[in-house]
From Swiss-Prot:
It comes from the Eukaryota. It comes from Caenorhabditis elegans. SUPFAM superfamilies: Family A G protein-coupled receptor-like. Keywords: Membrane, Transmembrane, Transmembrane helix. GO terms for cellular component: membrane. This is Serpentine receptor class delta-50. The chain crosses the membrane at residues 10-30, 48-68, 107-127, 147-167, 202-222, 250-270, 280-300. The keyword Membrane applies.
Length: 337
């Protein structure tokens, strides 16, 4: 049975995840609308990479939400807290997925993790595309697809390592019962890794660390190269320089966001494994941060991709003009009457 503190934390986190889901989907749908509405020629090929990133964010958001249709209320169906134990790590999933069994929750967890890793590689190939366009000024359609295929190789290897990692649920439950007797385990779907010291599990952790800290570093290297090219060349139109600089600034921030969001949870995971300590409050506090960036990522794209920002402003200005015209017309009609 849950303690009073655990019950309150579950309630708070449920409210948080509902708000997160609505905000994330709203920002993603807004970006999708602008991408479909804005037909700027300069973004014709770049849209391939932006659609790829947005699609992965849809997957990472909906993968925790897709089974909700079997319930009557709106709730995010898959959220986890990481619980440390001796040589293992367990995810306690509280949501409708628990009614469908551990296999469903495990599949959803793999989809979440893999799609988030894929988002990082998608940002890197977007940087590479901009760099190639400035240096060679050409990129074939087959080149785009080749880039996309290569970008999914890393997430695929990560997924294989994750699937091959030992996940003896009975061992996890037995260990959790002994080490954390106050946890209401009957209220969760429990999954995780029963031995984090195997080659597969260690490789997965190493790939997480490289992805977490390496992606921003690679992005900053490409950013420096691109800015240097823009400053040294006089053949580019001023508008193209401004637009490229703004887009690169946005992509840079997008690669830094996951680092900021993942750091609390990943740092706690590493700390707990080495110290063999845990905190119920910290487990709940750090669990949501890994997904929060999917709220802000589309907004950064809207702001820093200038054609999308201008399209958004044009729609907003048109709406205000229509509202003002309607008000003036009705006010004039009232006075005449």
């Amino acid at each position: 049975m849950m303690s009073a503190m655990e019950t309150n934390m579950v309630l708070i986190l449920t409210i948080f995840y509902n708000a997160y889901f609505l905000l994330a989907i709203s920002s993603q749908l807004l970006l999708l609308y602008l991408m479909l509405k804005c037909q700027n020629r300069s973004l014709h090929e770049m849209r391939i990479y932006l659609f790829n990133i947005l699609g992965l964010q849809f997957i990472s958001t909906f993968s925790a939400f897709v089974l909700q249709c079997r319930l009557k209320r709106v709730t995010l169906k898959h959220f986890c807290r990481i619980v440390p134990s001796s040589g293992t790590v367990a995810m306690l999933c509280y949501g409708p997925c628990k009614y469908l069994g551990n296999i469903v929750c495990e599949v959803l967890f793999h989809i979440l993790q893999t799609s988030l890793i894929a988002c990082a590689t998608a940002l890197i190939i977007a940087f590479y595309y901009r760099y190639e366009m400035l240096t060679n000024n050409s990129f074939t359609r087959s080149g785009h697809y080749k880039q996309l295929v290569i970008s999914y190789c890393v997430p695929l290897v990560f997924l294989i390592c994750e699937v091959l990692s030992p996940n003896d649920v009975n061992k996890l439950v037995a260990e959790l019962t002994v080490l954390h007797p106050t946890y209401g385990l009957e209220n969760y779907a429990i999954l995780g890794f029963s031995d984090v010291k195997t080659v597969a599990a260690s490789s997965q952790t190493l790939m997480l660390m490289i992805g977490l800290y390496g992606t921003p570093f690679i992005a900053l290297v490409f950013r420096k190269k691109i800015i240097k090219i823009l400053h040294s060349s006089r053949s580019y139109h001023a508008e193209k320089i401004v637009q490229t600089k703004s887009m690169i600034q946005g992509l840079t921030l997008q690669t830094l966001l996951p680092l900021i969001c993942y750091c609390p949870g990943f740092t706690y995971y590493i700390y707990s494994q080495y110290t063999q300590s845990s905190s119920l409050f910290v487990e709940f506090a750090v669990s949501p941060y890994g997904f929060v960036y999917t709220i802000f990522d589309p907004l950064l794209t809207i702001y820093y991709v200038l054609p999308y920002r201008r399209t958004f402003k044009a729609i907003f200005s048109k709406h205000n003009s229509t509202t003002s015209a309607t008000f003036v017309h009705s006010e004039t009609a009232r006075r005449v009457a």
